[in-house]
């Protein structure tokens, strides 16, 4: 609902004829992709002309399905910190540092629903109406599954100009001389 509200407000401010490019990072990438897929079934939603994803949460580790269990001890006051996978100072305005167990569970459920929708839309040939998707993904990402982005999304996309940019560390460079 938040994504639909944001797009509706953006279109109100820019005018209905302005192009719509949706950009999403991590969980926002999953929401951007979900919205784009939802437009294939709902003509009232503004259709994007381009989808740009940065480390999109198309899939995460399967252990996230059990993250809700990790928070159960938090019902006892002495174990209240169990509701969090990690608690850190919040200094980054673009990313939460602390992560509640329920957020991990909700992220897992979102990725499963998104993957199911992608499969159904591919089977029904609806992905042919999807705008081009441009994705930037680090192969070193420990949260988002690069494999899921390729297998669950890109292997199902039509030949519409969609691209994935994978990047990694330069393992050949030696930094020892810089650190002396």
Per-range role (PLM):
Residues 95-180:
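Serine-hydrolase catalytic core
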Residues 51-63, 169:
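Active-site nucleophile loop of the alpha/beta-hydrolase fold
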Residues 59-118, 179-180:
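The alpha/beta-hydrolase serine catalytic core
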Residues 22-24, 54, 136:
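Short beta-strand immediately N-terminal to the catalytic nucleophile in serine-hydrolase-like folds
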Residues 23-28, 32:
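Gly/Ala-rich beta-loop-alpha elbow adjacent to hydrolase catalytic centers
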Residues 14, 39-43, 157:
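Active-site catalytic pocket residues across diverse enzymes, especially alpha/beta-hydrolases
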Residues 34-38:
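Active-site signature of alpha/beta-hydrolase-fold catalytic machinery across serine-
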Residues 2-14:
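Alpha/beta-hydrolase active-site loop
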